Amino acid sequence: MAVTDTESPHLGEITCGTLLEKLQEIWDEVGESDDERDKLLLQIEQECLDVYKRKVEQAAKSRAELLQTLSDANAELSSLTMSLGDKSLVGIPDKSSGTIKEQLAAIAPALEQLWQQKEERVREFSDVQSQIQKICGDIAGGLSNEVPIVDESDLSLKKLDDFQSQLQELQKEKSDRLRKVLEFVSTVHDLCAVLGLDFLSTVTEVHPSLDEDTSVQSKSISNETLSRLAKTVLTLKDDKKQRLQKLQELATQLIDLWNLMDTPDEERELFDHVTCNISSSVDEVTVPGALARDLIEQAEVEVDRLDQLKASRMKEIAFKKQSELEEIYARAHVEVNPESARERIMSLIDSGNVEPTELLADMDSQISKAKEEAFSRKDILDRVEKWMSACEEESWLEDYNRDQNRYSASRGAHLNLKRAEKARILVSKIPAMVDTLVAKTRAWEEEHSMSFAYDGVPLLAMLDEYGMLRQEREEEKRRLREQKKVQEQPHVEQESAFSTRPSPARPVSAKKTVGPRANNGGANGTHNRRLSLNANQNGSRSTAKEAGRRETLNRPAAPTNYVAISKEEAASSPVSGAADHQVPASP
C-alpha cells in the first residue's frame, strides 16, 4: 500500500522539493546508502544542467534566426523602397529601436504594404506595356503574342508616367487612324451602293477585319490597310465618273427618242432613274444603284429598242390610247366596239391620209370626253354596286331562312346569325336604294338626253324588271305561307283532339319550308328561275339590245336572287317605274 501511495501523488503539489523529499522517503524505505544517494543526486543535477544547456542553445539559435529575418526584412525593405521610389518611404518605422521581435513587428506591416504596392505597380506597368505593344502591333500590321517583361528594379511613378504618356500618344494615333479607316470604309460603302457593287466583298479584299460583323476597335489600322483603302476609293470614284458620263449620254438619247415619238409620261417614268441624273455632277449622285451596271445596260437596251421601233411606234401609241379609252369605258360600264375602232386606226395609219399627230390629238380628245362621261356616271355606278351587293345579301338571307338548322349550336352558327341580322338591315334599305337610283338615273338621262346603259342594258329597264320580279317573288312567298297553314291545320286539330304530346309522325321542326321553295318549283308548276345581270342573260331579256349582241364582254355577276323570265314574258309584262313595284324586304 505504501508503494501505491508514493506512485500517485497529487499533480498539483509536485515541485522539485516535494520530489526530492519523496525520493528521500523511498531511499529510506529501500535502504539506499549515502554513496548511492550522492551518486544519484549528482546524476540528477547533471541531467538538469544538460536541459538548461539545450534550452540556452535553442534560444541562441532562435535569436540568430530572428536577427537574420530582421536583416532580410531590412534588406527587402530597402530594395522595395528603391524600386518604388522616394514617395513610398513614408510610414517606414525606425529599425534600430526596441527588441528584435518589436523591430520585426514594426517592419512587417510596412513590408506587407510595400509588397502590395509593388504587385499593384507591376500590374499597372504590365497593363500599360501590353497596350503599348498591342497598338504598336496594330500600326505595324503584325500581331504579337509575347507577354511584355516588366523591369521590377524600377517601378517608380515617374517611369509609369512615361509609359502612360507614350500610351496616350499611341491611343491618339490609333484613334486618328481608326477615324480615317471608318471614313474610307463609309466612302467605299456609299460608292459601292451607287455603283451597285458588293460592299462586303470589296472591303474584305482590302482587309478581312473591315466587314460589318467586326467591332470597330478590332478593325485594321495598319499602314498597308490605309494605303489599300485610299487606292480602292480612288478606283471607285473613277469608275463612278465614267459610269455617270455613260448614263448621261444614254439619258440624252432617250429623251430625244421620246420627244421624237411622243412617248407618254407613264413610259418615260419607267426610266426616271436614268434621266434624273442627266445634269448631275459626280458628287450629287448618291442614290443607291443609280449607276449600277445593269441599269446602264438596261438603258442601252432601251435606246436600241427605241431606235428599231421608230417606224412602227405610231401604231403602238395609237393602240395604247385606244386601250386607255376602252379601259375608261369598261370601268364606266359603257359598251363599245373595240374591234372596229382598232380596224379604223390601222386603216388610217396604213393609208397615210392622216397625219399621226392629228390622229393622236383626236384620240386624246376622245379620251378626255370619255373621262368626263365616266365622272358623270360615277355616282350612279357606285349606287348600282351597292344595290347589287344588297341583292346578293338578300339572296343569301333567303337561303339562310330556308335552313332548318340555322339556330343549331353548330360551329360558326353565331357568325351566320350576326350576318343575317346585318343582311336584314341591308335588305330593308333596298327599296330606298332603288328609289334613289331611279331618280338619279332619270335626272342623268334628262341632263344628257340619252339612255343610261349599264354594260349595254338600260338601267331603268333593269330596275323596273327587278321591282316586278321582287313583287312576284313576294306574292309567291305569301301563297306558300298560306298553303303551309292549310297543310298544317289537320295535324293541329288531331293533336288537340287526341293528345297534347307530339306524335312521332309530326314534323320535327315547325320552321321547315313546305312548298315549291323546297323543291325549286312553284305551287302550280311554275318554274322558279334566277335572273343574272351578265352579258349572256341580259341579251335574252333586254328590249334595248339586238338578239345577237356580243357575249364576251366581262361584267360583274348579277344578284343571285333574281327570278329569270323569258323574252316573251318580259315583252308582254307592263314596264313601269321601279317605285311602282317595290315591296317590303323579306325578313
Curated annotation (Swiss-Prot):
GO terms for cellular component: cell cortex; microtubule; nucleus; phragmoplast; spindle. InterPro entries: MAP65_Ase1_PRC1. GO terms for biological process: cell division; cortical microtubule organization. Changing S586A: Impaired microtubule binding and abnormal subcellular localization (e.g. reduced localization in spindle midzone during anaphase) leading to disturbed mitosis. Residues 474-494, 543-553 have a biased composition (Basic and acidic residues). Keywords: Cell cycle, Cell division, Coiled coil, Cytoplasm, Cytoskeleton, Microtubule, Mitosis, Nucleus, Phosphoprotein. Residues 531-542 have a biased composition (Polar residues). Expressed in all organs and tissues with the exception of sepals and anthers. Bound to subsets of microtubules in the cells of root epidermis, hypocotyl and cotyledons (at protein level). Residues 474-587 are annotated as: Disordered. Basal phosphorylation at all stages of the cell cycle. MT-binding properties inhibited by hyperphosphorylation mediated by CDKs and/or MAPKs (e.g. ANP2, ANP3, MPK4 and MPK6) during prometaphase and metaphase. It is found in: Nucleus; Cytoplasm; Cytoplasm, Cytoskeleton, Spindle; Cytoplasm, Cytoskeleton, Phragmoplast. The keyword Aminoacyl-tRNA synthetase does not apply. Induction: Expressed throughout the cell cycle. Changing S573A: Impaired microtubule binding and abnormal subcellular localization (e.g. reduced localization in spindle midzone during anaphase) leading to disturbed mitosis. One of its GO terms (molecular function) is microtubule binding. It comes from the Eukaryota. The modification Phosphoserine is found at S503, S532, S540, S573, S576, S586. The keyword Metal-binding does not apply. Changing T552A: Impaired microtubule binding and abnormal subcellular localization (e.g. reduced localization in spindle midzone during anaphase). The modification Phosphothreonine is found at T526, T543, T552. Forms dimer. Binds to MT, mostly with coaligned MT, both between parallel or antiparallel, forming thick bundles. Interacts with the alpha-tubulin subunit of the tubulin heterodimer. Bundles polymerized MT via the formation of 25-nm crossbridges at specific stages of the cell cycle (e.g. bundles microtubules in interphase, anaphase and telophase but does not bind microtubules in prophase or metaphase), at the plus-end, the minus-end, or along the entire length of MT, and along phragmoplast MT. Interacts with SH3P1 and MPK4. Belongs to the MAP65/ASE1 family. Microtubule-associated protein that bundle and stabilize adjacent microtubules (MT) of the cell cortex. Enhances MT nucleation. Can also bind to tubulin dimers and promotes their polymerization. Confers MT resistance to the drug propyzamide and cold conditions. Plays a role in the central spindle at anaphase to early cytokinesis but is not essential at the midline of the phragmoplast at later stages. Represses metaphase spindle organization and the transition to anaphase in dephosphorylated active form. Promotes the formation of a planar network of antiparallel microtubules. This is 65-kDa microtubule-associated protein 1. It comes from Arabidopsis thaliana (Mouse-ear cress).
